[in-house]
Amino acid sequence: MLMGCKNSNTNDQTSIYADEMVLIVNYQLENMTLEEHAELGSAVAPSFTSENVPGLLGKSFIGNLETEIFGGVYYFSNQKDVDVYLESELWKGVVAHPNLVNFKTDVFKKMIFLEKTN
């Protein structure tokens, strides 16, 4: 579960993301150096725009050098947009890359808790 906090006294637009979903993707490298992985990331990063991926609010590349697990955290407007992405040619191309292996995906609903007022 991913949690966020919202101050109920503020009048922000958090509610427009009430259905926001988070997709976390992990994978390992096989026969690929960190430098080659960085080059690949730089090459594909421009593809991750809201024009190319409907409903995408943002994406961060992640990695742990000690465990050698890498991946991404994607923020989507809703579950339907996550599902569309996971069926897209862009996603199919990512998981088909021969040097990216052992994919794991998890989807979470962003939780928003209102601050209690007295």
Go through each PLM region and give its residues.
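Short S/T/G/P-rich N-terminal loop/turn motif that feeds into the first structured element of a domain
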Residues: 1-69, 80-87, 103-118
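Conserved RNP beta-strands of RNA recognition motif
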Residues: 72-76
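A common structural junction motif
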Residues: 92-98
